C-alpha cells in the first residue's frame, strides 16, 4: 500500500506523523465541497525535502491549495509544467520554501516540498469538489482512512494527532435520512441544513468514514 501524507525524501522515506487533521465539507445532492487541513511537525536536525501524497477520488477536482512551512505561506498558483519546475528549483537554490504539485495517478496527487528546516510546523490545506453519485436513492460520501491514518506505535509512539470531521448537508427537505455505518454521529439542524459531527473524539481513522444520505430526488453530476 502506498504511503500517504508527508514523506521525507532524504530521511530514509520515513513519514512525518500528523498533529492535526480537520475535514470540513458542504454537501448537496450532487456535489461535495471539501476542505482538508493537515498539520505536521518536523523534528529532525537538518534541512530536508519531502513529498506529500494526497488520495483523491476520480470524481474530484482540486480547487484550492495552501501550504505553510514555518512562517512561510505559499498559495497555489497554476503554471505550465516546465515553468513550474524551473520556479521550484530556483526557490530551492535560493534557500526559500517552495512546492511543486504533480498529479501522478487518477486517485492521488503528489506535492514536492523543499527546504524544510528542523523543528518546523508544516500545514497543508487542500480544497476540492467531488461528484456525489446516487444508487437506489442513496448517496454515499467517504473520507478515506489515509487522510488520518494510525501510525505504528514502535515508530512514532501512541498517536497524538487530533481528528475533526464536520459536514453540512444542504436541501434538508429533500432528505429522508442520514446515517453512518462506520462512525457514531451527532446532528443539529438550522433552516434547511443538517450539520453533522463525530459524536465522540477520535485520534485517527481505523476505517473509512462513510456517510449515507437517503433521498427521493433525481441527482445530476456537476463535474463532467
Which ranges hold each PLM region?
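Subset of Sec-pathway N-terminal targeting signals
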Residues: 1-224
Amino acid at each position: 500500500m502506498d504511503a500517504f501524507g508527508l514523506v521525507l525524501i532524504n530521511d530514509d522515506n520515513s513519514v512525518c506523523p500528523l498533529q492535526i487533521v480537520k475535514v470540513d465539507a458542504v454537501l448537496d445532492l450532487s456535489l461535495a465541497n471539501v476542505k482538508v487541513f493537515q498539520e505536521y511537525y518536523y523534528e529532525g536536525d537538518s534541512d530536508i525535502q519531502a513529498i506529500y501524497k494526497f488520495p483523491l477520488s476520480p470524481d474530484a477536482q482540486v480547487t484550492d491549495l495552501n501550504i505553510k512551512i514555518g512562517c512561510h505561506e505559499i498559495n497555489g498558483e497554476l503554471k505550465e509544467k516546465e515553468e513550474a519546475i524551473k520556479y521550484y528549483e530556483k526557490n530551492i537554490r535560493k534557500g526559500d520554501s517552495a512546492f511543486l504539485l504533480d498529479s501522478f495517478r487518477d486517485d492521488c496527487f503528489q506535492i514536492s516540498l523543499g527546504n524544510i528546516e528542523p523543528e518546523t510546523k508544516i500545514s497543508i490545506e487542500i480544497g476540492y469538489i467531488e461528484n456525489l453519485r446516487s444508487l437506489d436513492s442513496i448517496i454515499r460520501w467517504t473520507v478515506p482512512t489515509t487522510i488520518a491514518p494510525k501510525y505504528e506505535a514502535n515508530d512514532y509512539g501512541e498517536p497524538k494527532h487530533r481528528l475533526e470531521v464536520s459536514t453540512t448537508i444542504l436541501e434538508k427537505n429533500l432528505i429522508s435520512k442520514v446515517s453512518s455505518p462506520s462512525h457514531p454521529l451527532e446532528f443539529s439542524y438550522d433552516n434547511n441544513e443538517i450539520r453533522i459531527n463525530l459524536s465522540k473524539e477520535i485520534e485517527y481513522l481505523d476505517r473509512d468514514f462513510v456517510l449515507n444520505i437517503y433521498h427521493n430526488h433525481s441527482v445530476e453530476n456537476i463535474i463532467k
